[in-house]
């Protein structure tokens, strides 16, 4: 049993890739590429390393780097061109802007002509934008904050800046902004020194505001009602324990004078029978 376990561990360690290998693309991993033109199976091909090569490897590959159909360039020159113009690539029929400027600097004796005549119809004329700002203009630019006043804040600001006034002018200046929308608030009149408030007729609404003044006829009525509900036991209602019902008030209030005397006699008899 131990030998089987040791053999399994040994096989796993031997199959593990101890030497760093190059990465393969997802399309090439664990499958073969089928060439449709020749109808033949091709073996796996390793892709180039993802990590950029070291300077020592650069020197070895400078002699081997060749582009089919073009002249031989060294990797150092290609990196230098890529550093100058990182976002432009040379296509057939189009020359990068860095190569055009370099050619003009090397041959200044040639007559300068328009780039459209030198290049093909697909040539895009490069444009230079200078983002550098002169120091004088940079000093003039300053930050100015922008404030936006709301309607109620603007009204408060105008009221604060205006000189102190009294009377109707001060009331007109401090009117809120919702009066413009059609809502007219009722103006509260000051209390008279005599202690009585005079009812004022509102000219806008056409109605007079309600007052709390009570007439002499209404006030005793409320006093009587309050006196009837008041109890001497502090709000505790105790019903009467007498079994004899009081029928005097009932007959006097509900009996119609048009009832005949016979009906009155019958009611009197029934009342006498009910009494113990």
From Swiss-Prot:
Keywords: Biomineralization, Cytoplasm, Glycoprotein, Nucleus, Secreted, Signal. Residues 1-15 form the signal peptide. This is Odontogenic ameloblast-associated protein. Pfam families: ODAM (PF15424). Glycans are attached at residues 101, 113, 117, 246-248, 252-254, 258, 260, 270, 272. Belongs to the ODAM family. GO terms for cellular component: cytoplasm; extracellular region; nucleus. InterPro entries: Odam. PANTHER family: ODONTOGENIC AMELOBLAST-ASSOCIATED PROTEIN. Interacts (via C-terminus) with ARHGEF5. It is found in: Secreted; Cytoplasm; Nucleus. Its main location: secreted. GO terms for biological process: biomineral tissue development; odontogenesis of dentin-containing tooth. Residues 125-127 are annotated as: Interaction with ARHGEF5.
